Structure formats: C-alpha cells, structure tokens
Design a protein with these regions (language model features):
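Non-catalytic alpha/beta scaffold blocks inside enzyme catalytic domains
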Residues: 1-7, 11-205
C-alpha cells in the first residue's frame, strides 16, 4: 500500500534529504511512458490538465481537431459505467482487466455486458476471451520503439525478430484503424510518432 510506505518513510525521517525518498515500481512495463504520453483520463501528454483552456487550445491547434475538455473515466469508473449501460463498447490495448481489476467479478460481468469488445494483445488473455474482435500485436523484441522506466529514462528497443503470423506492431494497428475511420494519419515509423511526442512533452527535452 503506497500510503503505508509514505507514512513509514515520514516516520523514519527518510524524505527530503540526500539518499532518501520513495521509488515504488509501477504495475506494468512502460506504464510510466504511457502516463507521460497522456494515457490518463484527465490529462493530455506531460500531465497537462484537459480542463484548462490554454492546454486545450494548444492541442487543438497541434492536432487540428476539436477536443473535449471534460475529464475521462478511470478504469474502475469505466466498469461502473458499463453496469450503468452508459458504455456499450470498448477497445482494450495491452491490458487485462479480467485479471487486474480490483473487483474481478464486477469487471468480468461488465465485459460480458458489452455490445462490442475489441482486444489488442500479444496473448489470448482472460480479457480477450470476452472479445468480439482480437488484433494480434507484436511483442517487445518484434518491434521498434521506446519505453520509459520508473526513473523516467527513455529506453530504445530495436526489432530483433519478425512477428509471428498476422501479428502487427501496436502503433501500426492504431494508425490503420485511424485511417480507416477517416483520420489523416500518415505515420510510417515510430520515429515519426516520437517526434510528435517531443512537440507535446517538454519533459522529453532532457
């Protein structure tokens, strides 16, 4: 429990001085990088709040599209919204809420209730068993890209193996879906995506 660790560090005087502090590991690989890039429902990339007009204006201009300034739902709130019949479809990429949600029975019931579920993953996970559509994704050694570790260091990965069968890189699948939905996405390589990220994330300029 994070609060217990914080309390312990405070009680023992291990906060605010050299060689002290907390450094808890995050739950999954690259969760730090995903958070930095804006995969938090109330934030744009680099932890810029969606309900601040100057942030919204910046990203609307950069992406040339209108954006909603309402905060999104957390994973737990999404499961509640499915039970309330306000969410009817989901696209789950690289997550397994049928095993990771704090209330598994509640989450599994929610996944069963969806009218349409798309899952993109490298394995046929427990969540994928509820899916109407499965996109097979590439594993880490099968693609180019970066991850950000808990220490906020960006680490490059280079493709070492070809993907099996019909598996594709995550960015490619997302890019193709965007194009088929009418978006003018023209990414050809993760390098181009990273260059755009650097425009939105001052934290990368280190």
């Amino acid at each position: 429990n994070a609060r217990c660790l914080i309390s312990l560090a405070l009680m023992t005087g291990n906060v605010g001085k050299r060689g002290s502090g907390l450094h808890p590991l995050r739950g999954q690989n690259n969760v730090q990088g995903a958070s930095d890039a804006g995969l938090i429902p109330m934030m744009y990339p680099d932890y810029q709040l969606v309900d601040k007009d100057n942030n919204k204006d910046f990203f609307e201009k950069l992406w040339n599209t209108p954006l909603d300034d309402k905060k999104g739902l957390t994973v737990v709130e999404i499961m509640d919204a499915i039970h309330e019949n306000t969410i009817k479809g989901m696209y789950i990429l690289g997550e397994n809420p049928a095993m990771s949600d704090p209330d598994l029975n509640h989450a599994r019931e929610a996944l069963q209730m969806l009218e349409h579920l798309v899952v993109q993953d490298i394995f046929l996970t427990e969540t994928a068993t509820y899916a109407d559509v499965i996109f097979p994704a590439s594993a880490w050694p099968e693609k180019n890209g970066t991850v950000t570790n808990t220490n906020r260091q960006v680490q490059m990965g280079r493709k070492a193996l070809d993907s099996p069968g019909e598996a594709k890189e995550d960015w490619w699948i997302t890019n193709e879906l965007g194009k088929r939905m009418g978006l003018n996405w023209k990414y050809k390589h993760p390098k181009e995506i990273y260059e755009e990220m650097s425009l939105t994330m001052p934290s990368l300029n280190n």
